[in-house]
Structure formats: structure tokens, C-alpha cells
């Protein structure tokens, strides 16, 4: 998983030094055991982080990603990206990622068996 901060990282007081309070972008890799939590309760918590602008979910077993982008009114817009040709524009950090960028050196089970 990845968190991006612009400026100086801020952490929860009296907590472990890995609890950021000011990320602008969070990327989560979904696993079968955590996918429901990452898409549900965890994202609900992340939506309370004022600085957060984008939340990206990346599937580990196929070339698929979902991007939630915070809108001006505070709502979140979902965009799905499926397949080799998809590109994800990350407006929070002015960057575009292709599926090949995201899945570089990843071998999926069906590819490994062929």
C-alpha cells in the first residue's frame, strides 16, 4: 500500500510513526481477505481525512483498479479501470499510470500456468 503527502508528513500524536493524518492520495492493494474491509469500513474512515483527494484500489489477481476522487461538494466519484489499455489519471499528484506501470513484473496465475 502507498500513501502520498505533499509537504511535511503529519502523524497522530502518541501513536506509532506510521499513522499519517495528511495524505492526499492512498493506494490499497486488494486481497480476497481484506477487499470488503478496504472498500467499506476503511474507506469510510479515510473519507474523514480532510486532505485526502484520491483513493485507489488495485486488484492483485487481475488488471483492474478503482479510483475514488473527492468532489468539490465532498462527495466521492468512482471510476473503474479494467484491462490492459486502461490509464489512471491521478489529479492529486498530476500523474498518469498505465496498467503496465501498476502491474510491472506481476505474473498472474493463468499466465504462469501457460
What kind of feature is each model-predicted range?
Residues 1-49, 54-114:
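C-terminal interaction segment
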Amino acid at each position: 500500500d502507498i500513501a502520498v503527502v505533499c509537504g511535511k508528513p503529519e502523524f497522530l500524536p502518541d501513536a506509532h510513526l506510521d499513522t499519517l493524518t495528511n495524505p492526499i492520495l492512498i493506494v490499497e492493494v486488494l486481497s480476497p481477505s481484506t477487499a470488503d474491509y478496504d472498500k467499506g469500513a476503511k474507506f469510510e474512515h479515510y473519507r474523514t481525512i480532510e486532505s485526502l483527494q484520491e483513493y485507489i484500489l488495485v486488484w492483485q489477481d487481475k488488471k483492474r483498479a478503482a479510483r475514488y476522487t473527492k468532489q468539490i461538494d465532498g462527495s466521492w466519484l468512482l471510476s473503474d479501470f479494467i484491462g490492459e489499455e486502461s490509464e489512471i489519471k491521478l489529479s492529486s499528484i498530476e500523474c498518469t499510470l498505465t496498467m503496465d506501470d501498476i502491474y510491472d513484473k506481476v505474473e498472474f496465475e493463468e499466465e504462469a500456468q501457460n
